[in-house]
Amino acid sequence: MQGFKQHTGLVVPLDAANVDTDAIIPKQFLQKVSRLGFGKHLFHDWRFLDDAGEQPNPEFVMNHARYQGASILLARENFGCGSSREHAPWALADYGIRAMIAPSFADIFYSNSINNQMVPVRLTEQEVDELFQYVQATEGAQIEVDLEALKVRANDKEYSFGIDDFRRHCLLNGLDHIGLTLQHEDKIAAFEADIPAFLR
């Protein structure tokens, strides 16, 4: 998996609190276990006026021309609440989101996002307010998320954020659960070599 060190991208401001996983990816699209293809269904009930997803809702922020190609999502508190479906971060990642910034995230969604190589950045409500004001007032506004320095940079300002060392290590090095296991491949091989033949 691709590691995440720094990323600068266009920002889409989703000015809503308590956005749940059913809004992020509605239940009717949870019929497969591949991570790919969910981006087109992201926020389906908000992005589209019809069930088939053929009539974009012109009022929904992600359909505005100025936010097309956004790779950073700016949101309000408790983003990703609701059921623990991993399809929610799959949909965001498949859409092209690399990082999310909010005052808080639901715990399971936070972990699932990191497992899918997206960086969920927690800032204070005041700092998030400042970023909303900047992004909404500035067409083409970009934000830099620097995981190495644990900084967010925007509009000539710098904000600090935290993440535990283990999760940061995984994100920086592009490690999922399989990748973490393979880091100990030599120890696994040595253990297997010591197993008696009749147990193999």
Swiss-Prot record:
Transport listed as a keyword: no
Gene Ontology MF terms: 3-isopropylmalate dehydratase activity
Domain of life: Bacteria
Record's GO cellular component terms: 3-isopropylmalate dehydratase complex
Enzyme Commission no: 4.2.1.33
Subunit: Heterodimer of LeuC and LeuD.
Similarity comment text for this entry: Belongs to the LeuD family. LeuD type 1 subfamily.
Its job: Catalyzes the isomerization between 2-isopropylmalate and 3-isopropylmalate, via the formation of 2-isopropylmaleate.
NCBIfam families hit by this protein: leuD, PRK01641.1
The name this protein goes by in its record: 3-isopropylmalate dehydratase small subunit
Organism in which the protein naturally occurs: Vibrio vulnificus (strain CMCP6)
Gene symbol of the encoding locus: leuD
